[in-house]
Structure formats: structure tokens, C-alpha cells
């Protein structure tokens, strides 16, 4: 009986403190009955690399360390678009502008979840020739670091777009 109480006294608080949080469902907004499948090429506006770290630990010798992760959102977006058959271009050529999308990325919010927070990103696809929006998608992610949050949010937003 004492053993059961001991196990429950450890298990219940740990479940309460580390419970799963549900992420908001990704949101997709289409404009003028357009589809990104009508396009062949994409140009991603450059983004800066983001580095974040978590977890500091020590041992009996006083050695400390942590985990550092980095992400460049435009690389993650490009990889997903490559998997879906799109071709990345380094510049927009007037002859191909009608078949080219401009892809913009932005962090659009944070939400407190349990003992941490999640990050929401918004990805905008624009017609390169008319400068009109094709589709805008948003997704939310939560991971160990801010880099993980952004990576998961991008994946969730674009995963829904390509279903």
C-alpha cells in the first residue's frame, strides 16, 4: 500500500505539471478561387537564422552544458515546397512571373500553454505578376526550444495546405 501511494504521489503531480496542450487548428484563407497548384516556381523572401537554447545541467565536476538549436524559416518552407514539386528561383523573371509565387513568412503570435508558450506563424503566398494574395496559412507549434516551436508551426501550417 505504501508503495502504491508513493507511486501515485509522484505520478499524479508529474502528469498535472507536464500535461499535453492542444494546439490551435491551422487556418487557411484562399483568395479568388486560386490554388497554389496553378504555379510552378516560388521565391522565398530571405529570413534570418534563429538560434535558441534550453536545458542547463551540471555534474559533480561543475561541468555545465545545454542544447542549442537553430532554424532558418525560409529553408524549412523551401524544403516542404520542394517535396510538393515546386521549383525555387533566386529571382523573379518577367517571363515566368505568372507561374511564380512569392512566399513571405512571419511570426504572428504567442500563446501561454501550461508552463511554456507556443508560437504561431503565418505564411503568405502572393502572385508574382499581380502582387495579389493566393493563399495565407497559419499554424501553431510548441517544442523544446523556440526553434522547435517555429519548425513545428511551419510544418503544421503547410501540412494542412497540401492535404
Which residues fall in each region the model found?
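Sec-dependent bacterial lipoprotein signal peptides
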Residues: 1-22
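Residues embedded in well-ordered secondary-structure elements
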Residues: 9, 33, 112-114
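Surface-exposed short loop/turn segments
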Residues: 26-28, 61-71, 75-148, 152-155
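C-terminal alpha-helix
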Residues: 156-163
Amino acid at each position: 500500500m505504501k508503495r502504491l501511494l508513493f507511486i501515485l504521489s509522484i505520478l499524479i503531480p508529474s502528469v498535472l505539471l507536464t500535461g499535453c496542450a492542444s494546439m490551435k487548428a491551422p487556418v487557411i484563407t484562399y483568395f479568388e478561387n486560386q490554388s497554389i497548384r496553378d504555379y510552378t516556381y516560388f521565391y522565398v523572401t530571405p529570413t534570418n537564422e534563429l538560434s535558441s537554447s534550453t536545458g542547463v545541467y551540471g555534474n559533480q565536476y561543475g561541468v555545465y552544458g545545454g542544447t542549442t538549436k537553430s532554424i532558418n524559416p525560409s529553408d524549412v518552407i523551401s524544403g516542404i515546397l520542394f517535396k510538393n514539386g515546386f521549383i525555387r528561383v533566386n529571382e523573379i523573371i518577367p517571363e515566368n512571373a505568372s507561374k511564380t509565387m512569392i512566399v513571405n513568412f512571419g511570426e504572428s503570435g504567442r500563446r501561454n500553454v501550461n508552463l511554456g508558450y507556443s508560437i504561431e506563424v503565418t505564411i503568405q503566398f502572393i502572385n508574382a505578376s499581380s502582387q495579389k494574395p493566393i493563399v495565407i496559412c497559419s499554424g501553431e507549434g510548441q517544442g523544446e526550444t523556440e526553434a522547435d516551436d517555429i519548425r513545428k508551426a511551419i510544418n503544421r501550417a503547410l501540412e494542412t495546405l497540401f492535404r
